[in-house]
């Protein structure tokens, strides 16, 4: 039994979000939420919300016990980039990419 939650186009670069995702992959759901709660990173707040949503999906849709859930899979994929322009010297311009992420969390019963 598995439950899934997805956050699309989160305004954080995938590289930064993957640093936090690697810390909680494979942990029990309760421990993952606790670890994310005390992290200072912006990605930790976003990932915590997705993990809590996946836990709620498992609890409400499948009647799973929260104590037995574990973070089976957590993926951070690249979303669409927002293109911005920054003026530079001599009339030139530089393109700035504001990157976004798709965060997917799958929780399931620990075996």
From Swiss-Prot:
GO biological process: translation
Subunit structure: Part of the 50S ribosomal subunit.
Keyword Ribonucleoprotein: yes
Keyword Ribosomal protein: yes
Protein name per Swiss-Prot or TrEMBL: Large ribosomal subunit protein uL22
An annotated Gene Ontology molecular function: structural constituent of ribosome
Function field: This protein binds specifically to 23S rRNA; its binding is stimulated by other ribosomal proteins, e.g. L4, L17, and L20. It is important during the early stages of 50S assembly. It makes multiple contacts with different domains of the 23S rRNA in the assembled 50S subunit and ribosome. The globular domain of the protein is located near the polypeptide exit tunnel on the outside of the subunit, while an extended beta-hairpin is found that lines the wall of the exit tunnel in the center of the 70S ribosome.
Gene: rplV
Family: Belongs to the universal ribosomal protein uL22 family.
GO CC annotation: cytosolic large ribosomal subunit
Pfam families the record matches: Ribosomal_L22
Superkingdom field: Bacteria
């Amino acid at each position: 039994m598995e439950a899934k939650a997805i956050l699309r186009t989160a305004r954080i670069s995938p590289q930064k979000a993957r640093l936090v995702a690697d810390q909680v992959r494979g942990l029990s759901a309760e421990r993952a939420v606790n670890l994310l709660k005390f992290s200072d990173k912006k990605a930790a707040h976003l990932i915590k919300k997705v993990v809590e949503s996946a836990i709620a999906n498992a609890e409400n849709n499948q009647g799973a016990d929260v104590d037995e859930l574990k973070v089976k899979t957590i993926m951070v994929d690249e979303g669409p980039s927002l293109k911005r322009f920054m003026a530079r010297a001599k009339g030139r311009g530089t393109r700035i990419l504001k990157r976004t992420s798709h965060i997917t969390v799958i929780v399931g019963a620990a075996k």
